[in-house]
C-alpha cells in the first residue's frame, strides 16, 4: 500500500541574494521601508526575490556606501567610528548595546568623499536562534551612539522651467552642490549641476520636457544594502 510522506523541515537550504535599493522604497514610509515579493509578481516599489523568504535562519550583509547623515558633517561626528543597522520587522531577535538599543549589524565607518562613507561590517553574519517564518517587509534603521540617523533624499519631485533651465527644489535636505550629478526622469543622460543657490539649481543642457513636474534622482544620496539570506525549506 502506497503511503504519502509527511511534510517536514529538513536540511535542504535555499540561498537568496537581495539588494535593498532606496529608489525602490515603499512610498510614504519613513524611515524607508521595502516590500519583498517573488520576481513573478510585478509592480512599483517592489524588491524582487527568488521566491518567498520563509524559514530564514541566517542573514549576511556586505560593505556598502551611505551618504553623510543629516546630523553629521565630518567623519569625526560618528561616535566611536561605528554605525549600527537594525531591521524593525526582526525586533524579536537582535543584539542589544549597553544602552539597550537593538541592532543586527555593526559597521566600521570609512570616509570615501566629502559626501559619502563606506560601512564595513564588523561581523557580517547574523544567525537567528529561531527561524523567521516569513519576511515580507524590511525596514532598516541606522543609528550611532548619539541616536537614529536620517539621510538626505535620493529622489525629489520637482518643478522645472525648460526655457530657463531652472529646477525649483521644494525642500532643503538634498545636500546638492555645484558639480553634483543628477538624473532627470525622462532623459537618459547624467546631468551636472552648474550652480545651486536660493533653492534653485541650474542644469546644463536640459532638454524640453513633456511635463513641468519631474523626478530628480541624486546618485550620491542613493543607498543600496546587499543582503544574503539562508532559509530552511520544507521537504516531503
Curated annotation (Swiss-Prot):
Induction text: Expressed in the late phase of the viral replicative cycle.
Alphabetized UniProt keyword annotations: Late protein, Virion
GO CC terms: virion component
UniProt keyword annotation of Nucleotide-binding present: no
Compartments, record wording: Virion
UniProt keyword Cytoplasm present: no
Function: Forms the penton at the fivefold vertices of the icosahedral capsid. Together with the minor capsid proteins (p17, p49, and M1249L), forms a complicated network immediately below the outer capsid shell, stabilizing the whole capsid.
Membership in a protein family: Belongs to the asfivirus H240R family.
Listed name of the protein: Penton protein H240R
Source species of the chain: African swine fever virus (isolate Pig/Kenya/KEN-50/1950) (ASFV)
